[in-house]
């Protein structure tokens, strides 16, 4: 009988392929459950199989997000400085929104709206 891989084992095999094949690996990290699981799997893999190797982490900061999400993202990125190369991006890009009947999009971190920003830009962002 052929043994089926469980999800964790399959993930470890796939991470090996990724880290063997690519010199630079980046994870897009929102602070949500899916990207959190992937980021932590990558960190654990590197600590176990490739100590000293770096992992790029890209976080697009939307300005108006839950405070707990922002705190979790900051805590997670700060807790692995030996592994993570963090790219914390705070740029005024066009984001669709469903919270207004008059506008179909908004721009976080727009300089022209600085007076009404939900919070100040983090000092470590691009």
Q: Where are these predicted regions, by residue range?
A:
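ATP-dependent adenylation/nucleotidyltransferase module used to activate substrates
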Residues: 1-126
């Amino acid at each position: 009988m052929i043994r089926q891989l469980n999800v964790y084992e399959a993930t470890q095999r796939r991470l090996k392929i990724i880290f063997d094949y690519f010199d630079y690996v980046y994870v897009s990290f929102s602070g949500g459950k899916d990207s959190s699981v992937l980021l932590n799997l990558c960190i654990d893999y590197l600590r176990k199989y490739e100590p000293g190797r770096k992992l790029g982490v890209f976080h697009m900061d939307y300005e108006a997000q839950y405070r707990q999400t922002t705190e979790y993202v900051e805590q997670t990125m700060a807790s692995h400085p030996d592994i993570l190369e963090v790219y914390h991006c705070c740029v005024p890009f066009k984001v669709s929104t469903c919270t207004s009947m008059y506008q179909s999009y908004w721009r976080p971190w727009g300089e022209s709206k600085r007076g009404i920003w939900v919070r100040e830009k983090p000092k470590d962002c691009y």
